[in-house]
Design a protein with these regions (language model features):
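Intrinsically disordered, low-complexity regulatory regions
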Residues: 1-25
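Alpha-solenoid helical repeat architecture
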Residues: 8-11, 51-54, 69, 96-99, ...
Length: 178
């Protein structure tokens, strides 16, 4: 193939990788002004579609950036959960089914960040998160199990009803067996 044809595609991929890595780094920085600025720049709207990117590292960094932003700001977390009837949340759950352990760790961490907000936990749970987190407890990777258990714990901390849903999903058995 001609280099002139391949080059724009390689540049496009490099640009996406640089974008998600940079946003993730800015979101995770110590300066809360970055989070506010990223919120004003509507970073979540730009990161959401990258959760379906065929390049796993782009998908993983997008999830990392979204999780970091959602953990830092309840309004951003609300946007993730409520955007187009939970479109971003559904993308996260859908990609968990087929992803590698590195993405699963990042996605479980993101789900934990969303679940920490009391005002959003019930909506996160109604999106089917518990089923996916319980299935991650069966993963052979210890860190996937750890982040999944952490997310389930955050759900439980938001009320008796949610804790009961976690227990009813057989999560305790999976934790004990794991």
């Amino acid at each position: 193939m001609s280099r002139a044809v391949i080059q724009p595609f390689e540049e496009y991929q490099r640009s996406r990788i640089i974008f998600v890595q940079t946003v993730a780094a800015l979101a995770g920085g110590k300066d809360n002004r970055n989070v506010e600025l990223l919120k004003r720049l509507d970073a979540i709207r730009l990161l959401g579609p990258l959760l379906t990117d065929p390049v796993i590292s782009i998908k993983q960094y997008a999830a990392l950036a979204i999780g970091t932003l959602a953990g830092a700001d309840e309004e951003i977390a609300s946007q993730v959960v409520n955007d187009d009837n939970g479109h971003i949340l559904n993308l996260i759950l859908k990609s968990l089914e087929t992803s590698n352990r590195f993405y699963k760790k990042t996605a479980c961490r993101l789900l934990g960040k969303l679940s920490k907000w009391k005002s959003l936990a019930a909506k996160v749970v109604s999106g089917g998160v518990i089923t996916f987190l319980v299935s991650c407890l069966e993963d052979c990777d210890g860190e996937v199990k750890q982040f999944s258990a952490n997310a389930l714990q955050k759900i439980c901390m938001n009320g008796e009803d949610l804790a009961r849903e976690v227990i009813n999903a057989k999560s305790i058995e999976n934790l004990i067996e794991g």
